[in-house]
Amino acid sequence: MAGKVILDFEKPLFELEAKLEEMRVCLRGSAREQDQQDADMLHRDIALLEQKVDALRRSIYKNLTRWQKVQLARHPERPYTLDYIYMMTRDFVELSGDRHFKDDKAIVGGFARLEESASGFSQTVMMIGHQKGRDTKSNLYRNFGMAQPEGYRKALRLMKLAEKFRKPVITLIDTPGAFPGIEAEERGQAEAIARNLFEMARLSVPIICVIIGEGASGGAIGIGVGDRVFMAENSWYSVISPESCSSILWRSWNYKEQAAEALKLTADDLLRQGIIDRIVPEPLGGAHTEPEAMAGTLKEMLVEELRDLMSKESDVLVRERVDKFSGMGVWDE
């Protein structure tokens, strides 16, 4: 299994895999010493252990709790926005700045070419998404994927540019939330997010939004209004993180597992509620185990939906998008 970071629920699997690797090393040693009898016994033991490993892997990843999916969504080796852009598209040209204050590195975006050779599909699209870092230095540079007002204003500028040139918009969402600092509030964080919701609802080109990791609160919905909303199988999308919910309701972070269950924040939950449209299947073990395969799956789904959305008139797109989001939730008059 790829990756060096081991989550707590993965430890039994990694221990078995380590034992399996030790046996394979012993087998190679037996082969050099030409001890055929020992080698045959090791072959049988390895085959049995491989079956146990496969069974345990399926047992773990096919029965993940909501909190465990939150942990996978935060896996530090999981593909981020730029990873998907470079794996799914070509000729990406990053565009910077909101033309008001500065360039927010927590959100990246630009034009790219989305192609599928099998079907002959080829389309220039505007790619926009949250970007996290891989280590402390890059996370500080990217502000841990927490966008400031200028990040959302940059995203809106790029969406308007895409609308001007009649190009579809694809947003990739992966954030623990919008940056909550005083300076962000002073520069109009709430207004910037609200403005994006208003403008995205009536943008005249197709919009597809994909939650690829964390989808926390207004930070996520700020680039999350689309004709189609996808969620990666092991991502989460909620008004609040399980830890914050736990600290509010129980005055402690120790109840984050219960909070995750109560929030119903997984892709399966949100598909049942009609909040999202499709789930992007992940390789067994998470997107980080086979990032190229994950990107290929997502690309196929994007192409399929873009074919449908690009055949619709602009007024139909806007009307259906507004109706889609207006129909969410339950209320009493």
Swiss-Prot record:
SUPFAM superfamilies: ClpP/crotonase. GO terms for molecular function: acetyl-CoA carboxylase activity; ATP binding; carboxyl- or carbamoyltransferase activity. Keywords: ATP-binding, Cytoplasm, Fatty acid biosynthesis, Fatty acid metabolism, Lipid biosynthesis, Lipid metabolism, Nucleotide-binding, Transferase. Coiled coil: none annotated. Residues 48-308 form the CoA carboxyltransferase C-terminal domain. Pfam families: ACCA (PF03255). GO terms for cellular component: acetyl-CoA carboxylase complex. Pathway: Lipid metabolism; malonyl-CoA biosynthesis; malonyl-CoA from acetyl-CoA: step 1/1. It is an enzyme of class 2 (transferase). It catalyses: N(6)-carboxybiotinyl-L-lysyl-[protein] + acetyl-CoA = N(6)-biotinyl-L-lysyl-[protein] + malonyl-CoA. GO terms for biological process: fatty acid biosynthetic process; malonyl-CoA biosynthetic process. Acetyl-CoA carboxylase is a heterohexamer composed of biotin carboxyl carrier protein (AccB), biotin carboxylase (AccC) and two subunits each of ACCase subunit alpha (AccA) and ACCase subunit beta (AccD). Belongs to the AccA family. Component of the acetyl coenzyme A carboxylase (ACC) complex. First, biotin carboxylase catalyzes the carboxylation of biotin on its carrier protein (BCCP) and then the CO(2) group is transferred by the carboxyltransferase to acetyl-CoA to form malonyl-CoA. This is Acetyl-coenzyme A carboxylase carboxyl transferase subunit alpha. It comes from Chlorobium limicola (strain DSM 245 / NBRC 103803 / 6330).
